[in-house]
């Protein structure tokens, strides 16, 4: 068998059309969703990500602000900038582009962002809400994975999902979202002994470790769904994921490519979260006016 390719770019475009309608509805009420991105230093990859976010905002008719800060900025100065954005009513989402310089604590910066404007879904309050099944801003990559599976009509209830990776950004929250959707979840990581023993049992494998060829055809069972979150370069300098795509696609039922797989979904869900924040802000304004 040859797997069906899950085209993240096409699914992201379909989701963006829905978001565009929501932005239009808000703009008719003279309310424009606003996203502020803080970029510290001049990391080239970070600059590319930020440009993509700015373009997505512009394409959807959203307001975006880019705040560039030097790499020698102090942690206190960065927190002051975040505080200003927390108070700014025209901004509904705040994102500090990671990674940060070594002298700045990512944990402290994430916690400085108001949970109501934490559209990355990294704040401990949003993580706690997600874990307890409450309404929350969901981390964008795991959120995008769930939306992709929904779009192809794949129901994860009762399925065994193996997450390879345990980062706070992808691995851990992805497992939680699958658990919330009634899947049985197993986590594997760098200290897992005999990775294939676990992944071969999986109906769904999510590879999120940042190391190419982590998942080969020997790691999956026939007909598994394979989601590749990795972003690496091969020997020719071409983008590739954590999955040995060419061999795994002949055994899987569905597989995401790299690029044009999970990547486009991440920024799309960031836009979705920002619009959701704006909708909540408008509701709060209406409630305040009534009272």
What are these regions (language model features)?
Residues 57-71, 185-187:
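Short beta-strand elements in bilobed, periplasmic/extracellular small-molecule ligand-binding domains
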Residues 77-89:
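Short, well-structured alpha-helical segments in soluble
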Residues 99, 209-211, 230-231:
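Short glycine-/small-residue-rich Rossmann-like dinucleotide-binding loops
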Residues 107-123, 127, 230-281:
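Rossmann-fold NAD(P)-binding glycine/threonine-rich loop
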Residues 1-31:
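Positively charged, low-complexity intrinsically disordered leader regions
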Residues 96-156:
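Anion-binding alpha/beta catalytic cores of soluble intermediary-metabolism enzymes, centered on
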Residues 42-54, 136-225, 238-246:
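Glycine-rich phosphate/diphosphate-binding loop of Rossmann-like nucleotide-binding domains
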Residues 2-6, 10-11, 264-291:
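C-terminal helix-to-coil terminal segments
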């Amino acid at each position: 068998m040859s797997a069906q390719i899950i085209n993240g770019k096409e699914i992201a475009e379909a989701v963006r059309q829905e978001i565009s309608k929501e932005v239009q509805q808000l703009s008719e009420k003279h309310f424009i969703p606003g996203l502020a991105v803080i970029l510290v230093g001049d990391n080239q990859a970070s600059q590319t990500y930020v440009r993509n976010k700015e373009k997505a905002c512009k394409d959807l008719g959203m307001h975006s602000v880019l705040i560039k800060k030097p790499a020698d900025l102090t942690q206190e100065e960065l927190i002051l900038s975040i505080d200003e954005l927390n108070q700014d009513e025209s901004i509904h989402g705040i994102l500090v582009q990671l990674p940060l310089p070594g002298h700045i604590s990512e944990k402290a910066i994430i916690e400085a962002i108001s949970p109501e404007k934490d559209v990355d879904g990294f704040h401990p309050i949003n993580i706690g809400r997600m874990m307890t099944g409450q309404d929350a801003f969901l981390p964008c990559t795991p959120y995008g994975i769930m939306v992709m599976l929904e779009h192809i009509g794949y129901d994860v209830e009762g399925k065994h999902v193996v997450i390879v990776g345990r980062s706070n950004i992808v691995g851990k929250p992805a497992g939680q979202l699958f658990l919330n959707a009634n899947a049985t979840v197993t986590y594997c990581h760098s200290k897992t002994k005999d990775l294939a023993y676990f992944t071969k049992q999986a109906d769904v494998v999510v590879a999120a470790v940042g190391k190419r060829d982590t998942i080969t055809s020997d790691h999956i069972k026939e007909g598994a769904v394979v989601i590749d979150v990795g972003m690496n370069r091969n020997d020719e300098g071409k983008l590739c994921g954590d999955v040995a795509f060419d061999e795994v696609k002949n055994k899987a039922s569905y597989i995401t490519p790299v690029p044009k797989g999970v990547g486009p979904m991440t920024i799309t869900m960031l836009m979705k979260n920002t619009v959701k924040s704006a909708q909540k802000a408008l509701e709060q304004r209406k409630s305040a006016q009534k009272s």
